Amino acid sequence: MRIDSHRFGTLELNADQLFLFPQGLIGMESLHQWALIPDPDNASVAWLQSAARGDRALAVISPRAFFPDYRVHIGRRDLSSLHLTSGSEVYVMTTVAGHVGKLTTNLRAPLMLNLDRRLGCQVITNDDRPMRQPLPTVAAESAKPLPTSQVRAA
């Protein structure tokens, strides 16, 4: 599959390199296939690039790289589209917005990825996490995927 990305130029990807978001993302419900692209300049950041729209790419981070105590509190039904099994691990990412020096991340609506099945969903958490949590200016090391044991379903 060829993606003409505004940010990365032309990308050649196999279908197995894409994540399927059956419900799309909040505000982009019609966009279902996304590629996770590492940022060439910052190991703490990746980009979720739409396969259908070259002009749609979201900066994402592992929130635990910046907020080690971050936990996702959601209902079991919210994870049903990921088709998780008892051994599945969920990788949690949050979107980044703003400008250098004033970056924020959305801890209220994380992206959940089932790496084995290449499925994703965006959920709204059951707690009062901020939608615009300021990010520390110091670059953080990449965090490991958040195991399902650390995703608390209500």
UniProtKB/Swiss-Prot annotation:
Q: Where does the chain cross the membrane?
A: none
Q: Which Gene3D superfamilies match?
A: BH3618-like
Q: Name one GO cellular component term.
A: cytoplasm
Q: Which InterPro entries match?
A: Flagellar_assembly_factor_FliW (IPR003775), Flagellar_assmbl_FliW_dom_sf (IPR024046)
**Gene Ontology BP, a term:** regulation of translation
Region feature Disordered, mapped onto this chain: 127-154
**Mind telling me which Pfam families this protein's record contains?**
FliW
Respond yes or no to whether keyword Chaperone is given for this record.
yes
Keyword field contains Manganese? no
Where does it live in the cell? Answer: Cytoplasm
Q: Which family does it belong to?
A: Belongs to the FliW family.
Q: What does this protein do?
A: Acts as an anti-CsrA protein, binds CsrA and prevents it from repressing translation of its target genes, one of which is flagellin. Binds to flagellin and participates in the assembly of the flagellum.
Give the quaternary structure: Interacts with translational regulator CsrA and flagellin(s).
- Name of the protein in its database record: Flagellar assembly factor FliW
Q: Which organism is it from?
A: Rhodopirellula baltica (strain DSM 10527 / NCIMB 13988 / SH1)
What phylogenetic lineage does the species belong to? Answer: Bacteria, Pseudomonadati, Planctomycetota, Planctomycetia, Pirellulales
| Name of encoding gene | fliW
